[in-house]
Amino acid sequence: MQSVVIDTNIVLDMWVFDDPRSRPLDEALRSQGLRWLASAEMREELLRVLGYPHLVQRMVLRGVSSSEVLAQFDQHAHSVPSAERAPYVCNDADDQKFIDLAVAHQALLISKDKEVLRMKNRLARLGVAVLPVWVPLA
């Protein structure tokens, strides 16, 4: 089973914004076709971000609560300890935890963050593929 690390913005795309591009990833997680690795630090970031006023408004419009989003996270993510610092450092310190975990577990990193995407070639040298959208293999 393929291991993945999922950036917070992708989680929001799945369960707050209902972005159609994130549906295949959501379906793969629900069917247990992927093993999503996440640390407590990643869950804490999601909890913090879900309190942002513009996201609270969006969740109200969609009839989704932050506790429901966190319940989805808890149901689908496999909790693992935070990883040691990877050899490459991201310009955005908030994204480093995702990079570190992906490198430590040789997992696919799903992120549309520009700073992470800029590191795509360097991370590939460490065995980590970075994709802005997960698409199942045909």
Q: In which residue ranges do the predicted regions lie?
A:
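Short, well-structured N-terminal submotif of metal-dependent ribonuclease cores
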Residues: 1-38
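Short beta-strands and strand-loop turn motifs
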Residues: 6, 80-83, 112
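Alpha-helix capping/helix-boundary segments
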Residues: 10-11, 42, 115-116
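Short, flexible loop segments at the rims of nucleotide/cofactor-binding pockets, characterized by
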Residues: 13-15, 59, 84-91
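Residues that scaffold the ATP/ADP-binding catalytic core of kinase and kinase-like folds
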Residues: 14-15, 49, 58, 119-120
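Residues at secondary-structure transition points
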Residues: 20, 37, 64, 89, ...
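PIN-domain endoribonuclease scaffold, especially VapC-family toxins
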Residues: 27-85
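Acidic, PIN/NYN-like endoribonuclease modules and their adjacent C-terminal/linker elements
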Residues: 89, 96, 103-110, 114-138
